[in-house]
């Protein structure tokens, strides 16, 4: 006499078995509507035939490697007319389509000699084999896992000779009783030439366009093209000081420095409507999927005379905390009639005031009318009036070679300096950084 617990367990087990049996029954019924117990109406059709035809027009190519490479397009067929309750296996092999060895010359495939001895016959058995006819008919049969190789290494891979043309062939074998061949099917539009690397660029383009697993190659190509374009000299690559980092022009764009030598950069000349490319990644607070060709600096370079204390480095757009220009004792204003130094000074922190713009004293040309609406990271700095100005000096004016070309000082009036100071303060106004 069984206990109540045993009876409940038996009912639960029976319920689970019934559920599994019903799932199997529904599986068998899925493709039964296409079935024919007599197998007289058996039909096999090629899936994606239009895509195969596009490749055939260009002479399709398939890569063969030592470790094996999968095919694209993937060979898929739809089947109808099988006995839904009978067991079948699907097999795939490849036969040579002609008696030529091929070569790619001047953009086209031409016969290139006698073929090599045919490789040992290799047959690929579909991993779902054997299975009911209903299973094969419910959905297209895909040979997506078959791999083509040029080495005889087994493992279910198909060995092919490179530079030979092949045609896939599908076989259907009835199993589970007296085994017999039902049918063999081949499709001329699936012919291809086995290669170790693609020869026709149009074939490569089609593979990348339609193969979802080839998008990485497309991304790599676009990344290389993007890098090449960014490295080409354009309107936005103006000569300037690399140590100034990122500029904030009046047009609202971000432009990196062009000079790779921070201590020997040319004069900075950036008109208010220059052609620098806008950076949507910085405006939209979203990082670019590709690395920027301009590497952000991790530390400020060292310059003579503590020039880094005069002009702060802006590392990246992430740390725009405030905009302020620290004061520096070597910031020397000059009058409008002061001539700029003719030589390259060793003090890049010397500045001159000319027409309301700020010009590095160490440069010949300076920043003339180039920073009208453009500002650096800084705030208006208040300087103690000085009673001297900078003028050009010759190399003979200093006894030490370290100070060749250095500036000499002459006394000027406080009122003259106050005028220069007001121009200096007026040209430096706070700028609100873009919201991050």
UniProtKB/Swiss-Prot annotation:
This is T-box transcription factor T. CDD domains: T-box_TBXT. Its main location: nucleus. It is linked to Embryo lacking the T gene fail to form the notochord, the entire posterior region and the allantois, and die at about 10 days of gestation. It comes from Mus musculus (Mouse). It is found in: Nucleus. The keyword Nucleus applies. GO terms for biological process: anatomical structure morphogenesis; anterior/posterior pattern specification; bone morphogenesis; cardiac muscle cell differentiation; cardiac muscle cell myoblast differentiation; cell population proliferation; cellular response to retinoic acid; determination of heart left/right asymmetry. Monomer. Binds DNA as a monomer. Gene3D superfamilies: Transcription factor, T-box. Residues 51-219 bind DNA. It holds the Pfam family T-box. GO terms for cellular component: chromatin; cytoplasm; nucleoplasm; nucleus. Keywords: Activator, Developmental protein, DNA-binding, Nucleus, Transcription, Transcription regulation. PROSITE patterns: TBOX_1 (PS01283), TBOX_2 (PS01264), TBOX_3 (PS50252).
